[in-house]
Amino acid sequence: MPYIGASNLSEHSFVNLKEKHAITHKGTSSSVASLQTPPSPDQENHIDNELENYDTSLSDVSTPNKKEGDEFEQSLRDTFASFRKTKPPPPLDFEQPRLPSTASSSVDSTVSSPLTDEDIKELEFLPNESTHSYSYNPLSPNSLAVRLRILKRSLEIIIQNPSMLLEPTPDDLPPLKEFAGRRSSLPRTSASANHLMNRNKSQIWNTTSATLNAFVNNTSSSSAASSALSNKKPGTPVFPNLDPTHSQTFHRANSLAYLPSILPEQDPLLKHNNSLFRGDYGNNISPERPSFRQPFKDQTSNLRNSSLLNERAYQEDETFLPHHGPSMDLLNEQRANLKSLLNLLNETLEKNTSERASDLHMISLFNLNKLMLGDPKKNNSERDKRTEKLKKILLDSLAEPFFEHYNFIGDNPIADTDELKEEIDEFTGSGDTTAITDIRPQQDYGRILRTFTSTKNSAPQAIFTCSQEDPWQFRAANDLACLVFGISQNAIRALTLMDLIHTDSRNFVLHKLLSTEGQEMVFTGEIIGIVQPETLSSSKVVWASFWAKRKNGLLVCVFEKVPCDYVDVLLNLDDFGAENIVDKCELLSDGPTLSSSSTLSLPKMASSPTGSKLEYSLERKILEKSYTKPTSTENRNGDENQLDGDSHSEPSLSSSPVRSKKSVKFANDIKDVKSISQSLAKLMDDVRNGVVFDPDDDLLPMPIKVCNHINETRYFTLNHLSYNIPCAVSSTVLEDELKLKIHSLPYQAGLFIVDSHTLDIVSSNKSILKNMFGYHFAELVGKSITEIIPSFPKFLQFINDKYPALDITLHKNKGLVLTEHFFRKIQAEIMGDRKSFYTSVGIDGLHRDGCEIKIDFQLRVMNSKVILLWVTHSRDVVFEEYNTNPSQLKMLKESELSLMSSASSSASSSKKSSSRISTGTLKDMSNLSTYEDLAHRTNKLKYEIGDDSRAHSQSTLSEQEQVPLENDKDSGEMMLADPEMKHKLELARIYSRDKSQFVKEGNFKVDENLIISKISLSPSTESLADSKSSGKGLSPLEEEKLIDENATENGLAGSPKDEDGIIMTNKRGNQPVSTFLRTPEKNIGAQKHVKKFSDFVSLQKMGEGAYGKVNLCIHKKNRYIVVIKMIFKERILVDTWVRDRKLGTIPSEIQIMATLNKKPHENILRLLDFFEDDDYYYIETPVHGETGCIDLFDLIEFKTNMTEFEAKLIFKQVVAGIKHLHDQGIVHRDIKDENVIVDSKGFVKIIDFGSAAYVKSGPFDVFVGTIDYAAPEVLGGNPYEGQPQDIWAIGILLYTVVFKENPFYNIDEILEGDLKFNNAEEVSEDCIELIKSILNRCVPKRPTIDDINNDKWLVI
């Protein structure tokens, strides 16, 4: 589901209205010291009253039996009694006065009133204006991130508290009925005994409740991460043993609205494990967290008891557990399973690697028959039972409703607690519900999708601008467009839009362009075939979603490659029977089968019951294929993930023989189109029999009539396994045959906006509506959602009857999220078979042709009038490497490269190549028409680059990567003899796993004095961190030279040096100790063919992107630790290669970094050395921060209480770094939050110079990255100079740091939208004025970097 929220204004007014309303309730005025004193009689009476209300609210809740219900009720009373008797914990620092919440003049947007025509008009265009409103990519962040992060946090809690795993889990599904009113019970059940601290033996918990209870109270959001008892004063830490900021996985944090049911299971071990919750987490409760939407209050109170998170948070969970026997074996196995799943989630969410697409997709389809934890080949019934219980726990966590208020993470606890109190009173029937309905409504629908977005977890998008008229000549493109389509930057000027469209899709695209003349929106995510060089020599089609809009005389196009299965069917022209079927994707077949006797089962028009044997066998096959270990790296990278459909790796199943059904055999089995698609066959029969006809049909022969009607209808369903799947069909009449090209998307999801009262569809994404349900937008807008989800009203009615607290029309439920698995669970309850939830494959949706398809949907309450549905259709597939990009090396001609020198000044280095390229050769350079002629040069160029690299390189990538990373870690840690170094690296590893720990006060603190001292250094002097003068009269450069000479004499060249530049050795003599390398090599690149990656041991994977990956490594011999960036040679854009007089033919990134080394700057990452082999360039850079670092994207996400002064210090360093670049005649061209890293002291480094260029090389046609940071003149297709565009980007960066969201969300807003500021934000006027001046669309009026550096807001 996308991160969809309401506007800043409406959200803030909602907070203040809640606060104002809740203050009128009783029991909210107790003092802060109430935690340290026993409850007053009035407070005790209030607790008793709340318990009475709770009893009433749960009077109709079904429990397993009466005894259990009595135990549950008694446990609540006992825990409240224990709360009264409990000795309070040591007091925290609450001396500082609390700042009052600032009232807002804006009004609440949740007031119930009919949707006006203006509302409907505005909402109608939203789902089609942005590429964030649809997704065909299982890796897309707007698909699963919210659900997976809930699951991730649950896993972390179970792993850190392994005693939970010893509790037996009942086989029966806890009925959702027990969740009724749980929002009101949340504070009482979880906080009554300070969570787990004072639990007594009468308390009843199960794994799910303990896990999610911890998760709820460990999430800092409005619903569950503030003061919990309604009678406590705001800010009182009722959970001193848990840190509410510990699980800030996203600044749009989620909070579970309801805890799972509490079942009668004892926990004998947890009582020994209290220190887990009293440890380092306990002292980190902040008495005041500034509002996320008011992030820059004058906050003077700091934590005094905070301490540095250490390994105990991750290791102490074993302290009090049995260390031998069956119990320990069980724990070890279960924890290993959970850690395996957690690692998978972390890697997929953080690094967005396409190799994990199948795994992520499987989690999105998660049910009991999926996601095998462990080796599926082992037949262990006990293990299977435990795994099944574990999966049930995870499923239950995915089904939990939660609230998501984007402004509430890190919010003022006053607003948090008062809102919670109001909702408790409303749930239980107490309190005063005064005039909330007489407030004038105000909507800002335009900001539904404008929440904080970034490219960090986004799939690569190719962006073009071209002319609006035929032939649609390209004007500009981004670098990813060159990478995706395999073209050079110079070739763009000679290409047209149709050159990139596959011949099978050109008619469709051309018709769409012509039929939408005069309209702004042209494409809204339609699926088309595109051209890549590899597709010219193969029949394999590459598919992409296509979004396009006319703006300012240009057509702006966005392509994103997507997984798509397709099949070609040739029909004879006599009886339209199937003559030949080419099914390389095995869309119509069932692929490898477990039994040679298996046959394809064709479903009926309606979906067959779920959980069929055939479906389960497919799931089993997929899982076994996923867990089949490749025999070598080549097999893993080559066979399983090959884009070419001619080669498929078959899973080696030890238990059963495997038979692959090839398309040629399958084609002989299918003669009737009805076997492929009943709805398609019916249309063809109706046309042939005259039931369906057009006025012009009488003049046309039958094949053309059939072809025209198929193309007009286009969207059908295929008979696929146990249920139907949607598809699109295009037809072409050939000489003797009718060709059908059928394509079907294994994953698609999109936004639907629905009136919550009438359930009419207000708007939806047009492409998703067609591809998933077969309807055109005009056919369904304004009609009921039951047209496509027939059971939707039944679900809502059931929820309103059984769980009235979840009524989507209630004011208080704004921000309520009902997940996909929640509706699966509701469906199971309606069916009277709660266990079926665990094997559910989705909800029935209705296609236009009358066939049922399986879908899932997530519901979000925008306000009491509008709900947002994120509807998903997905099926079980193992995604191949659909995102493979063609090699750029085929286009490289060294004779045409610019000649530069890293040793000279920027002026001479920026000389452009004098050779001009004729227009006639540009087509050849595009590689679209001469693939065969250029292909043979690939290997030759690959080995020629860098002067005899093949002869000198002593290892290949496959040899290096055969050593597993875990073994690398073990051997690397053996080299770390220094305990302090081990400790630092372990902290860095912990922080990389859980970035919320990095930004805690105990670790992260912006050091003002350090930053000011660094900024004040002259850029021309050597970095103090790298080489400090020893006081002997030598300059830093002279001293470094002397040190290097001495090191060479002693055989320690390349060894690490300390802060004084002294070679660090251990007691054994010349053997160096492990340390962080800071000083560059004397002659960078001198060992580029000698040094190899196998000389290093990888300690940690740090990231992966479109062009390469990054690892933390230690040198085996010299024991120095560096960060190595590995750049794929085949993905280096042909236009970014340069010939350096000293360094040879290298990527411009290395050349520019080497040039910057001559005049280093504190805020720019230095180049230590580089080397290469056949596949990669390896760039060595210093480690930033001894305990790791975090990029600005994550800092904004997790550092929710950042002050304006801290933001100023960080931004000032960015400005200083960019100023140094501009002074050297260099433009960065890819400034964004991900390319700014920050250490634990707030010290900043600018990284990633892969797109950097010299100013004199401009003007530039190709821009870098995605739309978010692109300047309007760049999107307008105009050549740009570089520096003003860097300025625009840092303006976007500043706005993002201050307001936690991008200022512009789509192309319209970038080109002509007003710059909006939230009046409720307590941001200084000077800061706002600076942002306004930077984000000026008039390029001449945009300030220079010197103007910004001297701005009064940046004066410190």
Swiss-Prot record:
Record's compositionally biased regions (Polar residues): 26-37, 54-64, 952-961, 1021-1032
Residue ranges, annotated region (Disordered): 20-115, 592-612, 627-660, 948-972, 1021-1066
Domain PAS: 450-518, 738-807
Keywords: ATP-binding, Cytoplasm, Kinase, Nucleotide-binding, Phosphoprotein, Repeat, Serine/threonine-protein kinase, Transferase, Translation regulation
Annotated residues for binding of ATP: M1102, G1103, E1104, G1105, A1106, Y1107, G1108, K1109, V1110, K1125
Active site: D1230 (proton acceptor)
Domain named Protein kinase: residues: 1096-1354
Residues recorded with modification Phosphoserine: S10, S192, S202, S255, S286, S327, S926, S1018, S1023, S1035, S1055
Catalyzed reaction equations: L-seryl-[protein] + ATP = O-phospho-L-seryl-[protein] + ADP + H(+); L-threonyl-[protein] + ATP = O-phospho-L-threonyl-[protein] + ADP + H(+)
Paired cysteines (S-S): none
Transmembrane segments: none
Role according to the record: Serine/threonine-protein kinase involved in the control of sugar metabolism and translation. Phosphorylates UGP1, which is required for normal glycogen and beta-(1,6)-glucan synthesis. This phosphorylation shifts glucose partitioning toward cell wall glucan synthesis at the expense of glycogen synthesis.
PANTHER family named in the record: MAP/MICROTUBULE AFFINITY-REGULATING KINASE, PAS DOMAIN-CONTAINING SERINE_THREONINE-PROTEIN KINASE
Note: Present with 967 molecules/cell in log phase SD medium.
Name this protein carries in UniProt: Serine/threonine-protein kinase PSK1
Protein encoded by which gene: PSK1
